[in-house]
Amino acid sequence: GIGVKEGAEYRFSVWARGENQKLRIELIRNDTMEERQAFESKELTVNSKDWKQYEVILKSPRTEPKAHLRIFLESAGTVDLEHVSLFPVDTWKERKNGLRKDLVQALYDIKPGVFRFPGGCIVEGTDEATRYEWKKTVGAVENRPLNENRWHYTFKHRFFPDYFQTYGLGFFEYFQLSEDIGAEPLPILNCGLVCQYQNDPDQQVSLSKLDSYIQDALDLIEFANGDVTTTWGKVRADMGHPAPFNLKFLGIGNEQWGPEYPERLKQFVEVLRKAHPEIKIVGSSGPQSEGKDFDYLWPEMKNLKVDLVDEHFYRPES
């Protein structure tokens, strides 16, 4: 269900096409036998053969932890719907497609110095096709693709059969949030390795095919810091932030291990040092805080002269 609160407003939006088709948008309780399940409804008319975005505001008269959204076609005919969304109006800084106020406030209150994103095996993906690609997370929200989440095959106890990510929160929102809470952004990019737990070395991106991955890193720096006359700086400006985000750090690779990692990282370092000596490169010491992989990677990171090494600790509090 969808949790709604008494007195709160929710923005329903949809991309639709059709000729004079009336829709009724409802918030309902489907666990009741009452004749009228809807406790809030609004109408809208789809009046164009071309794709067009429509919005109505629903105001909940009561608190319902498990409400449902229902869309009725009021008359005979055909209407196409795409990118259906129900979103709270009251978000952090009142932004459309914004973040929950209470969660951002909690982040702000702990005064983080660094904010790492997207982090974890999400960066790697289950395979190359499902890796996290930052360019797919910027621009109009309705044009961002759905992607299978890395943890889709891992947790049997999840509440839903499918586990996907919509990229509704992408790199623009991430940089903006980092700015809001006063933290230095630390974006992590794929280094040409997908999940090493699930893939053999011969299934990884070959060293001769890393150019597009390295270009993604260069373009991300341009998106964050570039002038509005540059390709990716203009994308940032068009999204509402002409000023640069002042990116200082860039992580290449998540919790990678073995010789496959430094031999790929080396190519990134060589290009980034020449193109952006001002950016501090962050490497990784792997998924463990000690042991064979850790002991192997630290000297490799020193040889590559990365600026910082991202150590990960998985230990009980004791």
What are these regions, as identified by a protein language model?
Residues 29-31, 121, 191-195, 256, ...:
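Active-site-proximal loop/turn and secondary-structure-junction residues that shape catalytic pockets
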Residues 63-64, 107-111, 179-180, 241-246, ...:
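Extracellular/periplasmic catalytic domains that process cell-envelope and extracellular macromolecules
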Residues 9, 102-105, 173-176, 180, ...:
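Alpha-helical scaffolding segments of alpha/beta enzyme cores, especially the outer helices
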Residues 72-75, 80-83, 88, 118-121, ...:
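Active-site groove signature of glycoside hydrolases
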Residues 113-117, 185-189, 248-252, 281-284, ...:
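Hydrophobic faces of well-ordered beta-strands that scaffold small-molecule active sites
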Residues 1-166, 184-186, 199-211, 218, ...:
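Extracellular and organelle-lumenal recognition/adhesion modules and their flexible linkers in secreted
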Residues 25, 60, 67-78, 236, ...:
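Noncatalytic carbohydrate-binding groove/subsite architecture in carbohydrate-active enzymes
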Residues 67, 98-102, 168-174, 223-242, ...:
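Alpha-helical scaffolding within the catalytic cores
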